[in-house]
A protein has these predicted regions:
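Alpha/beta catalytic barrel-like cores
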Residues: 1-123
Length: 124
């Protein structure tokens, strides 16, 4: 381990931030966490952009809906489409805001156990 960069400690953020201003949140992550900026979540923009909504929006082949504050599998809903659309929009805006940045970058997404625990099954 003679490579000094291999011993360097990095830190980053978890993802969720208050507010609804995506541009300001991204700028803050680049400013405050320059070693490993991250794609922020802004759950105040709606449930489809929080940790669970974002993760479910990335699933392919599984339909979900949000009903009375609970995500449910098996039914295609507008919130699932919103989650996917917001993800695409966030990544596009991130690309614009990160022009010229060439370092490491963190994107965190809820894993399968978190999504399973936060999702119910629609009863038909």
């Amino acid at each position: 381990m003679n490579d000094p960069s291999a011993r360097r400690v990095r830190f980053s953020g978890l993802g969720s931030l208050p507010g609804v201003d995506f541009r300001a949140a991204v700028a803050m992550t680049f400013d405050k966490v320059p070693g490993l900026p991250y794609l922020p979540e802004l759950p105040a923009r709606g449930p489809w952009v929080g940790m669970v909504g974002r993760g479910l929006g990335l699933l392919v082949g599984l339909d979900v809906e949000l009903l009375a504050g609970e995500w449910r599998l098996g039914v295609p809903g507008i919130d699932h489409r919103r989650s996917r659309a917001t993800w695409r929009d966030d990544v596009d805006r991130l690309e614009e805001l990160a022009q010229g940045y060439a370092g490491a970058f963190k994107v965190s997404v809820a894993g399968p156990w978190t999504l399973a625990a936060a999702t119910g099954v629609a009863h038909t």
